[in-house]
């Protein structure tokens, strides 16, 4: 299933991680942004970090995408430059 044509609204971001996030507390967990709202302060390809707890698995039409999560921009702690 392709997510390139879906539209999302600020403050939602879609991010990709290199591993599945399980319950627990990860400090400064990083992820790459793969989809933003048009008016987002972030851009595709930015690497951000935050605690893993705000990451919610991305589900579309009943399909859960592996290693893709939705996150609210307001929970981001910083950007890795």
Predicted regions span which residues?
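Compact, glycine-rich, soluble single-domain proteins
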Residues: 1-81
């Amino acid at each position: 299933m392709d997510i390139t044509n879906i539209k999302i609204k600020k403050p939602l971001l879609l991010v990709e991680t290199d591993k599945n996030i399980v319950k627990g507390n990860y400090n400064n967990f990083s992820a790459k942004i793969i989809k933003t709202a048009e008016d987002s302060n972030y851009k595709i390809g930015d690497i951000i970090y935050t605690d893993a707890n705000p990451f919610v698995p991305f589900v579309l039409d009943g399909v859960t995408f592996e290693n893709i999560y939705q996150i609210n921009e307001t929970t981001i702690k910083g950007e890795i430059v």
